[in-house]
């Protein structure tokens, strides 16, 4: 029964607005407390921003940089609140983490023109894993509010030869938009999308791990953007157009009247030219 309850709860969460995930998740846990751990580990939540007081830069919070009640900054590698024995990446991986944060900071600035990004890496037995986080919130300056949260979890299995690696990428994007205009009123639109891909890539000085991961993330985000734009927003536009005419009502009546008159004329012509039996 618990498996069925979990499946139903996850299916429900997928259909609810992403800007209300925390409230909806809390309500579900109150209804079924036994699902608390499974829901918290399975449902992606909107990313929160914190400030690194050491270097004066923002970073994103998630389960992957949390140890107890403290969160590790990718910039200073310090926990806040301070934690003496918090989990840390190895020296080799920390160096790679610093380079990855700098690379994706440029990627975020190029594609999103703002926002916050963070990269966290951790060691595995035969390689390493990491998460790339990007958050961009709209300021409502054009009467449009919204937020984009992308969470890319990558697992890297390094082959024994050291020349190739297997990459497994799981990406989740949460997006919501709210418009408030005098002509169209208020409209809310939101949802989340998860996609996964696996690929083998060559690892060399010309194509290091960061470049390979960067290409995978870039390709995945482009595909998700395209899916959101063409399918979700396209479908919404079709539905709205079906419910609400863009033309003025008098013009619409005139057009329909013209259609009826043309139809009558064509019908009369068909009757007129029909040969006698």
Curated annotation (Swiss-Prot):
The modification Phosphoserine is found at residues 2, 263. The keyword Ubl conjugation does not apply. Signal peptide: none annotated. One of its GO terms (molecular function) is actin binding. GO terms for cellular component: asymmetric synapse; brush border; cortical cytoskeleton; cytoskeletal calyx; cytosol; F-actin capping protein complex; hippocampal mossy fiber to CA3 synapse; intercalated disc. Coiled coil: none annotated. The modification N-acetylserine is found at residue 2. One of its GO terms (biological process) is lamellipodium assembly. Keywords: Acetylation, Actin capping, Actin-binding, Cytoplasm, Cytoskeleton, Phosphoprotein. InterPro entries: CapZ_alpha/beta, CapZ_alpha/beta_2, CAPZB, CAPZB_N, F-actin_capping_bsu_CS. The modification N6-acetyllysine is found at residue 235. F-actin-capping proteins bind in a Ca(2+)-independent manner to the fast growing ends of actin filaments (barbed end) thereby blocking the exchange of subunits at these ends. Unlike other capping proteins (such as gelsolin and severin), these proteins do not sever actin filaments. Plays a role in the regulation of cell morphology and cytoskeletal organization. Forms, with CAPZB, the barbed end of the fast growing ends of actin filaments in the dynactin complex and stabilizes dynactin structure. This is F-actin-capping protein subunit beta. It comes from Mus musculus (Mouse). The gene is Capzb.
């Amino acid at each position: 029964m618990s498996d069925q309850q979990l499946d139903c709860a996850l299916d429900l969460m997928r259909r609810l607005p992403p800007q209300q995930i925390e409230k909806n998740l809390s309500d579900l846990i109150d209804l079924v407390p036994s699902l608390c751990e499974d829901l918290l580990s399975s449902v992606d939540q909107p990313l929160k921003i914190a400030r690194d007081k050491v270097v004066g830069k923002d970073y994103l919070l998630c389960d992957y940089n949390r140890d107890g009640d403290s969160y590790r900054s990718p910039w200073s590698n310090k926990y806040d609140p301070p934690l003496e024995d918090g989990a840390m990446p190895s020296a080799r991986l920390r160096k790679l983490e610093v380079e990855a944060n700098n690379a994706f900071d440029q990627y975020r600035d190029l594609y999103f023109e703002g926002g916050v990004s963070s990269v966290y890496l951790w060691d595995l037995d035969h390689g390493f894993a990491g998460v790339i986080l990007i958050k961009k919130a709209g300021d409502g300056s054009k009467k449009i509010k919204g937020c984009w949260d992308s969470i890319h979890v990558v697992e890297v299995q390094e082959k024994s030869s050291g020349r190739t690696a297997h990459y497994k990428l799981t990406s989740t994007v949460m997006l919501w938009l709210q418009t408030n205009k005098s002509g169209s009123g208020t409209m809310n639109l939101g949802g989340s999308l998860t996609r996964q891909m696996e690929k083998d890539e060559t690892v060399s000085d010309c194509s290091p791990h960061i470049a390979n991961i960067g290409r995978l993330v870039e390709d995945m985000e482009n595909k998700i953007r395209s899916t959101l734009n063409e399918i979700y927003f396209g479908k919404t536009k079709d539905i709205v157009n079906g419910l609400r005419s863009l033309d003025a009502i008098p013009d619409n009546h005139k057009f329909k009247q013209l259609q009826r008159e043309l139809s009558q004329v064509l019908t009369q012509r068909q009757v007129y030219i029909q040969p006698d039996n």
